[in-house]
Amino acid sequence: VIERSMEPFFISSIDKIFVVVGFEKERILKIIECHPAEIIENPFYSQGMSASIRVALPYIKGYEGVFFQLGDRPFLDKTLIEKMVHTFQENDKDIIVPVYNKKKGHPVLIRPAPYIEEMEKVKGDMGLREIIDKYRENVLFIESQEGVLTGLDTQEDIENLKKRGYEIEKD
């Protein structure tokens, strides 16, 4: 699941990839060891996804745009990533969010500079949601596929996908 979630980024035109690891760090490092990524360790992973955002901030401050992707979204493709990059470059919006059936998904592409102070304060599993909601005028929502919503966090998530006809490989 993790490798499939990251694959669209590895094969895209993105210049630099950072991967934040915490929970099951050794297993994740083994999965991604053959890919070009800089590893950021998150000792605070038990505090939720926002801790991963906070520990990444020193690494991303100089970048024009940064994707935030979850490790449990295996149904994304390179086309979406490239579409988001192109949309980001062609618009004056600071944040690009894919949506499916009017629901916000992942990954999120953000121009970090205007939001660094607020990103330093995010807590729990809210991630960038509060920033997206607060600065809606700076957000461009783009229609996407169901994969932007489909996370595989639990065995129940996997079983639900199987019931819908998906074949799921074991890591």
Predicted regions and their residues:
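Hydrophobic residues at beta-strand termini and immediately following loops
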Residues: 40-42, 98, 142, 152
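A generic structural signal for alpha->beta connector loops
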Residues: 14, 36, 92-93, 136-138
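A generic "binding-loop/recognition-motif" signal
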Residues: 24, 72, 145
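Alpha-helix/helix-capping structural signal
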Residues: 23, 113-114, 147, 156
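Conserved alpha/beta core of the MobA/IspD/sugar-nucleotide pyrophosphorylase nucleotidyltransferase superfamily
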Residues: 121-171
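Conserved N-terminal catalytic core of the sugar/cofactor nucleotidyltransferase
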Residues: 2-65, 79, 121
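Conserved beta-loop-beta/alpha segment of the NTase-like Rossmann-fold superfamily
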Residues: 46-112, 117
